[in-house]
Every structure is written in C-alpha cells, then in structure tokens.
Amino acid sequence: MSATELPTKEAHILKGHEGAVLAARFNGDGNYALTCGKDRTIRLWNPHRGILIKTYKSHGREVRDVHVTSDNAKFCSCGGDRQVYYWDVSTGRVIRKFRGHDGEVNAVKFNDSSSVVVSAGFDRSLRVWDCRSHSVEPVQIIDTFLDTVMSVVLTKTEIIGGSVDGTVRTFDMRIGREMSDNLGQPVNCISISNDGNCVLAGCLDSTLRLLDRTTGELLQVYKGHISKSFKTDCCLTNSDAHVIGGSEDGLVFFWDLVDAKVLSKFRAHDLVVTSVSYHPKEDCMLTSSVDGTIRVWKK
Amino acid sequence: MGSDEEDFVFHGTPIEREEEIASRKKKAVAGASGNLRTLPAWKQEVTDEEGRRRFHGAFTGGYSAGYYNTVGSKEGWAPQSFTSSRQNRAGARKQSISDFLDEDEKADMEGKSLSASSQFDTFGFTAAEHSRKHAEKEQHERPSAIPGPVPDELVAPVSESIGVKLLLKMGWRRGHSIKEVRASSDARREARKAFLAFYTDENTKETPDSLVSETEVETSLGEDIKISESTPVYVLNPKQDLHGLGYDPFKHAPEFREKKRSRMSANKEVGFRKPLSMKESLFGPKSGKIAPGFGIGALEELDVEDEDVYAGYDFDQTYVIEDEQPARQSNDNRLRLTSKEHDVLPGFGAAKNSDYSMERFNPPIIPKDFVARHKFSGPLEAETKPTVSAPPEVPPPADNNLKLLIEGFATFVSRCGKLYEDLSREKNQSNQLFDFLREGNGHDYYARRLWEEQQKRKDQSKLTLDVKVSPTVQKMTAETRGSLLGEKPLQRSLKETDTSASSGGSFQFPTNLSDTFTKSASSQEAADAVKPFKDDPAKQERFEQFLKEKYKGGLRTTDSNRVNSMSESARAQERLDFEAAAEAIEKGKAYKEVRRATEQPLDFLAGGLQFTSGGTEQIKDTGVVDMKSSKTYPKREEFQWRPSPLLCKRFDLPDPFMGKLPPAPRARNKMDSLVFLPDTVKAASARQVSESQVPKKETSIEEPEVEVEVENVERPVDLYKAIFSDDSEDDEDQPMNGKIQEGQEKKNEAAATTLNRLIAGDFLESLGKELGFEVPMEEEIKSRSKPEDSSDKRLDRPGLKEKVEEKTSSLTLGSEEEKSRKKREKSPGKRSGGNDLSSSESSGDERRRKRYNKKDRHRNDSESDSSSDYHSRDKQGSRSRSKRRESSREKRSSHKKHSKHRRTKKSSSSRYSSDEEQKESRREKKRRRD
C-alpha cells in the first residue's frame, strides 16, 4: 500500500475535555468513541460528525482507560481512584464498583463475551472481576509481575499483560501455564494483531517490538519515534499491514509491518500523543493528546 | 326620730359588742382578698388586724410595711409541724418531789449523799444503789403498758452469796484457805477441852498431859504427809546458801552438815520466840500465843478462836524438827545416787528424750601414695628434645642382617615413640640380636639412625603442607588448564606461535584499536584472521566466504590486508565481496521465520569452528545492537499457572486443574529477580560446548509441554464428557458427510456447533449454581436433590430465554437468514426441553432425553455434523491442533470482517441520535424474534 491510502487527513477536532485526554477508544462497530482524561470525566462522541453525545461523571480522580462491551450496552473505566467502574451507557449510571487494587489502575479490558473485566494496576497485579454475579471480590489475582502492569489484552483463551519490568506475560487458561517473554526494556503498551498471532509491544527505549506469540521470537523492530518518559500508545491497522505509534513530540508514525520502514509521519498534535486508536473496519483513526483535544483522521 | 337624737347628748365611747367585732373581722378578710385579686395596686389600702384602715407605716417607721397584705403572721411564712395528742391522753404520771424541785435544788440533794467507790464496796451497797438508779432511768426512758414502779426496783442484786455466809458461820474468814481452816478448827476444839480441864483441875495427874501430847504428834505427822504429797520437793527444801549448783561443801565431812542443821533449828527457835514476845506485849494476857499456820490478815482483829493454848511448850516444836530431818536425808541420798549413776550434777536429773543428735564428719583419709609436691613431666620432656644434638655419623656394622634390623627398628621407634624401645628392651634382654639397645654392637649406628628417622618425620610434616599447596599452583598454569579443557587450545597455541613469529607488527595494532578486549581474546582473533590467508590463495571461492564472515569484524580485515601483500586484482575482488556481504546483512534485518530456518543449516554445514568463531565475534561487537538484542532478548520462560475455576467457566473453558488441590502460592520476592542476574551472566559467558547443548535442552523442554497439553485436555468434567460422547456417537453414524461438504458450509457449521455448545454449557452451569454446586461431580448428589429439581427447573425456563438473548446479541455471525432459520429449528428443541424439565424424573432418563434432543438437533442441522468432525479430529494430536488453531483463527478473522461490513451498512442507514438508535435497534430485534 502507498502512503496516500493511510488516514493522514484531519476530519474533525473533538473539543470538550478540560485537561489532558489519556485514552480514546472506538466501540466494537466503530460508530462511536469514548474518551477519558484528567478532568475525571468520560465523554461519548460521534467522531464522524464531531458531536459530543454524553458525559459520565463519577470518578474522583483522573480516568486512565475505558473499554466498551461488544453489545455496546455497557462500558468499564479505571483511573487514579483505585477502582474499576462498570457503567450503563444509556442511563449513565454506575452499575457496580470493583475495589481491591492497592494502587492506580492503568488499563481495563472486557473479554469477548463481556462476562469478565480484567484490570492492570500499579500494585503489580492483574485482577479479574465478574460482571454476571453481584460479587465484588476479584475472581482471580495474578501477581507474578515484578513491577507496574501498564497494559492488558485478552483473547478467547489467554490473558496477556505488559509490565514495566520488561516482560510480556501470557496466562493460558486452557493449559494452565504462564509464558514470560523478557524484552529487557520497560513495556509501555501492548497490542495484539487481528489474526492473534503477534503481539506489538511499545517499549520506553523509543522502540516498538513485534513478537511471535507461539514461539516468543522477535519478528521486527520499529524505530523513529520518541517514547522515553510518557505513556504513548501503539496499534495495528485493521488489515494488519501497518503499525501505528504515537510520539512524545506530537507526531504520529506509520511503519510497514514487514519492512519496518517509516511510510509517513505527520504532526497530529502540539504535545504528547497519549492514545492512538484505529477503526475496526474503515480507514479511520483517533488520536488524543495532552493538549485536551481528540482528532479524527481519514484518507 | 330626728327630734329624739337632737334631745339626747352622748358622752364617752360606746361599748363594742362581740357581733360587731366579728363582722368587722370578716369584712376585713373579705376586703383583703378582694383587694389583692381584683383591685389594682394603686387602689389597695392598708388595714389593721381588726379591719380598720390605717396609714401605711408612716408613723411606725415602716416596721410593718411588709407584714399586712402579704403574710398571715408576724413570724413569717414558715408553717408549723403538726403533732397529734392521742398518745399523750392515756399517760397518767405520778408526781414526785423531783417534779416540783428546781434544777438547783436537785443538785443540792445529790451533793449531800455520800457513797463508796467500787474498789471499796465490800458490802455491795453502792452497787445496789447504782442498780436502783439505772432501773429508774430505764423506767423513765421507755414507756410501759402497766403503770407503776418496775419490779426491778424491788429486786436488788446482792454482793454476798449464801455459801459465803455459811462458811463465815462455820469459822471461815476471808483470806484463809478452806482446808487449813478445817484442820485447825478440829485441833482448836480439842485444845479448848484440854484447856478447860487443865484450868479446872490444876493439881490432877500427869497422864492426861502425855495423852494429849501423843494425839498432837499424830496430827502433826498426818499434816506433814499430806503436805509432802501435794507440794514438790524443792518447795519444801529451798536453796538457802550461796554456793553454785551441785556444789556440796560437806561432801567429805557429814559431821559438819549435822552441825549446820542444828544451827538452823536453833535459828528457827529464836524466830518463834520473838513474835511470841511481841504479841504478849501488844495484846496482853488474854491473847496469849498464836497457833502455827498461815498468818491472819493485818487488818483483821484477833478472835478468841485464834488463840493457842500450848504456845509456850518447846517440847512439841522439837518433835516436829526431828520428824523433818529424815525426809531431807532421804532426798539427799536420792540425789547422790542419781549423780553417781548418770554423772549429772546433783539436784538435776538426766532428760528422758534427747532430740539433738549431732552428725560427725570425719576428716578425709590421706592415701599412702600421696606426694605433696606436684611434678610436671610434660615440659621437661619437651625441653629435652631440642637440646639433643645430632649424633656423629657412624659406619654401618659388618652384618647386613643386623643393619637391616637396626634400620627397621629405628623407623618403628620414631613412629610409636620411646616406650616401644623400652618395652622391647625389657622383653629382649636375653636375645643377643637386640644388644644394640643395651650399648652393645651397633649401638652408635642405631642412635644415628634413630636421629635420622626423626628428622625425616619432621620433614614429612612440612612436605605434606607443601603437597597441599602444589595442586592449586598446578591449576593456575596454562598447560594444565589447556589439558583439562581439551585438545583445541593446544592447536591454537601451535598456530599462535607461528603467527606471532610471522606477523609481529599486526599483533600490536589490534590491541591498540580494541582496548576493551583481553589479550587472550585478541590473540585468538588474530589467529582466526590469519587462518584463511594460508589456505585461500589456492581456492578463491573459500576466500570469499571467509571474507564475508570477517566483514563483521570490520577493522581487523583491513589490518590483515595491509600486513599481507596482495595483488590489486585480489583487493578489487575483496571489495566486491564486502558489498555483497553488506547487502546480505541488510536483508537479514527483515528476515522472518522461514529465512532463519534456511540460514541455520548453512551454519551447521560450514563447520563447528566457523560457527563458534562467528558467535564469539558477534557477542564482542558493540556496534550491532539489534542483533545483540535479538539473541539475548526476548527471553522466554514458562511457569505453571493455575486459573480459578470460575474464570475458566466465564471463558467457557474446562479447568485444567480439575480435581487437584490448589498449590501453595509461590513467593516471588526481589531476591528472585537478583537470582536471575547471574544466570544471564553465565549464559553470556557460555562457550562453544554450552552453545551446542542449548538446542538439545530446548527440544527436551518442548516435549513435556506436549505431554502437559494432552493430559490437561483429557481431564474434562463429567458434564462435558456427556457432550463429547454425543459428538463421538454422531461421528460414528455419519463419518462420510464431513468430507463431502464444501468450505462455505463448514464455516456455518462451526458457528452452529459453537452456539449449541455455549447453550448447553450455560444451561449446565445454571443448574450447578442453583443446586448449590459449582460443578456437580456425582450422580448421588443429583438423586438426593430430587425434590429441589422441580422448583429449580421452573426457574430455569426464564434463565434459558435470557441466555439466548445475550448470546444472539454477542454473536457476530453472518447472514440474517441463517439466524432466522436456526431460531425456527431450535424452537421445537426448546419446547421439548421445557416439557422434560417440568416432569420430575430420574437423572438418567433426563440425560438420555438430552442426548436424543441433541441428536435431533444435529440431524436437523446437517451442517453441524461436519463441524463436530473438526472438533473430534482436533483430539488426535497436538501438532495438528496448532495448525488448525491458526486456520480457525483465520476463519474467525474473515467472519469478523464480513460482520463489520454489514454493521457499517446498518449504521449508515440510521440518522437519529445514539439513544434513539439504540431504541430502534431493540425494537427491530424484537420484531425479528417475533
């Protein structure tokens, strides 16, 4: 593919957050976007028209991550108040609060059937919460990490967590085994390919590393951006042909998956790009920044 | 009438009548009350007691200002206490003089009377008076139902009893004992008779005197006997001298003891005379002399009975003295006997029981062999040894046998000690062979030999220390290290010598350029660099290959070129080879698994030496960071991790550790992280041998993984076994259908089977939860919970509906038509299931019906059979599973893409806000379901 087919054209600017925006996520079908930030609010947008639909307020501190269920009826959020909030989208009501983390919660994810929420926390643990029953105790606590867990990804049979101790750990529930891939550098963000064979790990040495999940081999290394002090995001396009990464100088980079060649880079924001999210179907992208804006990019 | 009044003239004040006064008072009271209540303050008037109006204290000085109109009496508002007079009515008191006397007169009456104190109240009159007074007080204090004096006044206590009065009449006097009185009274009566007879007949015969004296003697003896029985001995014979206890001055002179006794008796006689003379002078002829016995009280007067008629006669006294003496003598004899027998002081007797028993500890017995001085043998022996000087050398004796004997014996003595020599000397005194021990033939040689043996022993001790140190020294040497490691370093050393001789200049340059490397490493590298040049001129192809490998070294190749003289054509060829190598490296960065697999066999073909050398170079190079990171990191480790059963349930997976006890939680502390560090260092420092072993370990590690997978998969729950058993039966029935059907149908089948499995799994989970078990293991539990089944089953119906709705929402299947078809097909199954649930039958029957239902479903849905074949095939082997997993992932991804496209179409059609769109979507879903 050529650079022209990549979404590098700004379509809309979503303004409303009164502080840094820490995460921007598409929902399952890509029609709506949820953003959260340091102003302790979660906002629901229609990114294709640049309209703010709803604002959710209950968090006591900054909100670090959000994730929507596949049926678009509920979502979960986490942040500095050490709790995981389970919300109803239409009513804006907090259905339940999951308490148990000893520090800030950095990331949350639903599984495919939306029956379980997995949260990654500052207390070096992954906690699994049950959404079906009314219990507020964690189903399981995974505390084999040696340092903060920054990111978490779920598949049908596995839980994958990336940590600052330099490891990407895969917990296989079918076999009952833990596989620890040590990259030697703090892992900031992890993302899984659409075919489920590869894991993309963003490290704090300004490098993105592509790993084979079955063998743990290093397939490719992507460089050029700056990622040393802040939490930046990385992801793959829906076609698994390109790798996208945000930079601390406000740029967004596109690499070729196979050649590790920088196809294009452009200035998306004036400050740190905190989050990058690609549309599940179309060639559309969301980027959020510390300057409080969310930008929608299209061809 | 008017005219009458004018005529009369009145003088003075008229007399007031009682009626008028009473009416006035009443008016005053009424007025006061009325004024206080009704009239205001400025209308109130001050009135007198009789109701008359008066000024408000103007002339009285304001004394009664607050009295009238406020309180009812002059004293104030204090109410008086009420006392009833019922009790006082009945009381009728007698009047006495005290009632009419004043206090002063009463005091005067009391002062006049005199009374004795309790000490001198001999007659008891004072006590009687006190008791009477006390009784009177009590009478006054307490009320009495019977009027009149209390009986206590009539009855007064008496100080003397009747017994005392009788004794007094019989002759007893206070201060005397009862016994003595009786005896003295009898004697006195007889005395009176005798006296009367004497006075009447002065000139009578002597015989009555002798009779009287005899009777007196008998009485005196009786008295003495009684006294001796009652009183102890030391009271009768008190110690009158000033000698010490047990001392007898008359021990050897009994004569003097008798004289002393006579003196004592004479003193007594003198004592008796004196009081008699005094009494005669005081009391006159009537009183006469006092009888012997206890004295009378000083205050009491002498009675007639107390006089003694025979006081003047000395004869009686002499008899008494003589009688007392033998008793004393007998006592003395007893004391003497006791003293002689028991060796005890006279006057004392030995005690019967002696509690004190002293333990005696004899001094220790000194053994005969004991020597006062302590001799230290040790230091003397030690001192003697160094002082011994080396004996002079002596030639061996002529006899060889003797020589051998002496040498052997010397060694034994040096080992065992001198005792051995002494013992052998004693035993072998008769034996001529051992004459050398007794300064015989060969003694000098023996002494020298012994000295030499001792010196050797000392040297051996030093040698042992040296021997211990030597092996460490040997290890440090290069030769030993090389020998231990193997043959390779020997080869290197030989080559190194040649290279150093040939190229001295080149050896120095790499050291300067690479300061970080050690000398040994640099020398090895130089050798490696030089190797191909000798072989290469003959074969250019090999040379090119070596050059490619050397390019990784970089600087060293140029140095080698300078040193070795090469032709220009060869240099040009080298440059071309370098370019080719660079291109290869660039391509290598973008390599994938396939390229790695192709490259590895090439390395093996090249040979062990080349492979190892390449590895070492790469490790030492610092420029190539990516290659370094690729090999050192990422590093994969595997641990056992146990998911909780609820987590597996939520992900619709069987628990791999079903039936096992939870393991103890492993403690991953900071120490564990520290432990990992030395492992990395060792891995980096690993040499050729270890690198070759690594792939073997990897293969060994892979094998248990496969086994683990097989074991875990083979441990599903009984409920899941039921599902799989049904699938297996289907496989047997229709094995051929799977192969025939096309790919498109396979996808649909896979989706359908997943739906069926999900429904069944959730149904079973709900059953388990409601029954109270996470996963029911045994049939017995189900049989026990039969009565609950009916209620639970009724609850299951809405649960099933809810689950179906959730799944339909969550599923991402393709066409709408297929969904509607499946729903229609499933509806009869659900209805039949409900009927079964409603009926309360055994679990076995239920299972069978479930199986039939599932079979029916499978038969109805022909597409699902082939998908079950896929699942059954997965069981066969782990290798095939991995491949199929990838294929299944690809299929799923394709499904997702299709579903995404369809969703986009739907979303594009909608034009309303999110809330309205959600509502419409829900309505549409409901319509579709209907």
UniProtKB/Swiss-Prot annotation, chain B:
Main subcellular localisation: nucleus
Biased composition regions of type Polar residues, renumbered to the chain: 499-508
Subcellular location: Nucleus speckle; Nucleus, Nucleoplasm
Phenotype upon gene inactivation: Developmental defects, elongation defects of all organs, reduced plant height, triple cotyledons phenotype, reduced vascularization and infertility due to failure to produce pollen.
Keywords recorded for this protein, A-Z: Growth regulation, Isopeptide bond, mRNA processing, Nucleus, RNA-binding, RNA-mediated gene silencing, Ubl conjugation
Tissue expression as described in the entry: Expressed in vasculature of cotyledons and leaves, young meristematic tissues, trichomes and pistils.
Ranges of compositional bias, category Basic and acidic residues: 489-498, 779-808, 858-877, 913-923
Record cross-link Glycyl lysine isopeptide (Lys-Gly) (interchain with G-Cter in ubiquitin), residues: 25
A single GO BP: RNA processing
A single cellular component GO annotation: nucleus
SURP motif repeats, residue ranges: 405-447
Pfam families: DUF1604, Surp
Source organism, top-level taxon: Eukaryota
Comp. bias (Acidic residues): 701-711
Biased composition (Basic residues): 848-857, 892-908
G-patch domain ranges (all copies): 159-199
Region annotation Disordered: where it falls in the sequence: 76-152, 478-508, 687-751, 773-930
Gene3D superfamilies: Surp module
GO molecular-function term, one example from the UniProt record: pre-miRNA binding
PROSITE patterns listed in its UniProt record: SURP
InterPro entries: DUF1604, Surp, SWAP/Surp_sf
Keyword RNA-binding annotated: yes
UniProt function note: Functions as a component of microRNA (miRNA) and small interfering RNA (siRNA) biogenesis. May assist DCL1 and DCL4 to efficiently process and/or recruit the precursors of miRNAs and siRNAs. In the miRNA biogenesis pathway, associates with the DCL1 complex that processes primary miRNAs (pri-miRNAs) into miRNAs. Binds pri-miRNAs and precursor miRNAs (pre-miRNAs). Is required for the interaction between pri-miRNAs and DRB1. Required for general proper plant growth and, in particular, initiation of vascular development.
Name listed for the protein in its UniProt record: G patch domain-containing protein TGH
Organism: Arabidopsis thaliana
Lineage of source species: Eukaryota, Viridiplantae, Streptophyta, Embryophyta, Tracheophyta
Gene that this sequence comes from: TGH
